[in-house]
C-alpha cells in the first residue's frame, strides 16, 4: 500500500457538493437541535466560511461538549461542535473509502453493508460449522482492548495514515482531529468524533494482518476492538494470545482487557450484543436488564413519555429479533403494554 499512497484528493473535500452532503449527514437525527438550527440559519455563509478556512489552512476544531453515558457501560463522550461534524463528514466522504479498502475482510465496524448483525450471523454460521466438524473440541479466544479509544497512540496512528495517504492537506486535517483530543498528552482520541471511529478501525488493521498473515489464525472476527478467534486446540489459542499481547504492547502500545480468556465453544461467546452457542444465540443478559430498567423508570419516575418508551423498545426488539428470542420479545412486549396501560388509566 505504501507504493500507491493516495494523493491529490484534498480539493474534493471542499467542493460545494461535498460540503452540502456533509451538512446533510451531520444534521441527520439532529435537525431540531439548537446547534443545527443555528448553523442552518445562515447555511450558505457558514459553509462558505468553513470552505475557506479548510482551503487556506486556518481551520481549527472547536471545544468539545463533554458528557457521560451509562449504557451499555459508563463512558465519557466528547462531542464536537456542529460545524466540526460537518467538516469531519466532508473529510470522511473523501478519504473513508481509501481507508476502508485496507480493512480485514472480517472487520465489521464502520463499514457500509456490514455492522454488528452481519458480524453475529457470520460468527454463528462458523460456530455451527466447526461444532459439526469437531464437536465440543473448538477453542475460543475472546478478547478486547483495555480502554481502547483512550489508549490510541497519536504517533502510531499518524504513521499508519501516512502509509495510506500522501496528500499533505488531507494529513493536516487528520492530524488536527487526532491532536484535538481534549487532553494534554498525545494519547487517546475522542469517542464522539466521526473521524475517531474510522481511525480506531485503521489502528487495529496491523493486528488483523499480524494474526492472519504471520500467526495464520484460521478464524478471526473483529468488531472495533472486540475480537474472537477460533482454534482446534487450546495450545493454538494460548500461543495466539501470547503473541498478540506482545504485538499489541510493542507495536501498538495497547494492552488487552484483563477479562480476555480462552474456553471451549460450548460455553458460548459474547460478541456484538449476543451470546453465541453452536446451535443458537441469545440476547445478552445486560441488554435485557437495560430494557427492564427503562420499563421500571417509566413506571416509577414519570420523566419518560410513552412515545420514548416505545421508541426504546422498538430499537431493543429490533436487536433482539436477530437472536432466538421470540418468547423473550413477547414477554417484554407485554411488560411495555402493561406499563403504558397503568399510566393511562
Give the location of each predicted region:
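A general alpha-helix detector
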Residues: 5, 156-160, 226, 294, ...
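Conserved two-metal-ion catalytic palm core of "right-hand" nucleic acid polymerases
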Residues: 1-157, 182
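PAPS/PAP-binding and catalytic site of the sulfotransferase fold
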Residues: 90-94, 241-244, 248
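Short, conserved aromatic-histidine micro-motifs
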Residues: 57-61, 217-223, 291-305
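Right-hand nucleic-acid polymerase module
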Residues: 80, 89, 180, 185, ...
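Active-site catalytic microenvironments for nucleophilic, acid-base chemistry
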Residues: 94-98, 206, 210, 247
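Intrinsically disordered, low-complexity and often Lys/Arg-enriched segments
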Residues: 1-12, 246, 337-345
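Conserved polymerase palm-domain catalytic core
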Residues: 46, 53-54, 106, 121, ...
Amino acid at each position: 500500500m505504501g507504493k500507491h499512497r493516495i494523493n491529490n484528493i484534498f480539493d474534493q473535500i471542499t467542493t460545494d457538493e461535498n460540503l452540502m452532503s456533509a451538512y446533510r449527514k451531520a444534521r441527520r437525527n439532529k435537525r431540531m437541535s439548537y446547534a443545527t438550527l443555528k448553523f442552518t440559519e445562515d447555511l450558505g455563509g457558514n459553509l462558505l466560511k468553513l470552505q475557506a478556512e479548510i482551503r487556506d489552512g486556518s481551520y481549527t476544531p472547536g471545544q468539545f461538549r463533554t458528557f457521560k453515558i451509562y449504557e451499555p457501560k459508563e463512558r465519557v463522550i466528547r462531542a464536537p461542535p456542529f460545524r466540526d461534524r460537518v467538516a469531519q463528514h466532508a473529510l470522511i466522504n473523501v478519504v473513508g473509502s481509501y481507508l476502508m479498502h485496507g480493512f480485514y475482510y472480517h472487520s465489521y465496524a464502520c463499514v457500509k453493508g456490514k455492522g454488528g448483525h452481519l458480524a453475529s450471523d457470520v460468527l454463528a454460521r462458523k460456530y455451527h460449522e466447526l461444532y459439526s466438524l469437531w464437536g465440543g473440541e473448538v477453542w475460543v479466544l475472546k478478547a478486547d482492548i483495555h480502554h481502547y479509544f483512550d489508549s490510541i497512540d497519536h504517533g502510531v496512528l499518524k504513521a499508519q495514515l501516512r502509509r495510506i495517504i500522501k496528500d499533505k492537506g488531507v494529513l493536516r486535517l487528520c492530524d488536527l482531529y487526532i491532536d484535538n483530543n481534549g487532553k494534554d498528552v498525545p494519547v487517546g482520541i475522542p469517542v464522539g468524533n466521526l473521524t475517531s471511529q474510522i481511525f480506531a478501525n485503521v489502528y487495529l488493521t496491523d493486528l488483523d494482518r499480524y494474526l492472519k498473515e504471520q500467526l495464520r489464525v484460521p478464524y478471526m472476527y473483529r468488531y472495533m476492538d472486540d475480537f474472537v478467534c477460533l482454534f482446534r486446540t487450546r495450545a493454538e489459542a494460548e500461543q495466539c494470545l501470547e503473541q498478540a499481547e506482545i504485538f499489541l504492547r510493542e507495536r501498538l502500545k495497547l494492552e488487552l482487557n484483563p477479562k480476555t480468556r480462552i474456553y471451549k465453544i460450548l460455553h458460548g461467546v459474547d460478541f456484538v450484543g449476543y451470546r453465541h452457542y453452536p446451535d443458537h444465540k441469545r440476547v445478552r443478559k445486560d441488554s435485557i436488564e437495560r430494557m427492564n430498567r427503562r420499563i421500571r423508570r417509566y413506571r416509577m419516575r414519570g420523566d419518560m413519555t410513552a412515545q420514548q418508551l416505545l421508541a426504546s423498545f422498538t430499537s431493543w426488539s429490533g436487536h433482539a429479533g436477530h437472536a432466538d428470542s421470540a418468547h423473550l420479545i413477547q414477554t417484554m412486549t407485554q411488560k411495555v403494554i402493561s406499563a403504558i396501560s397503568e399510566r393511562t388509566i
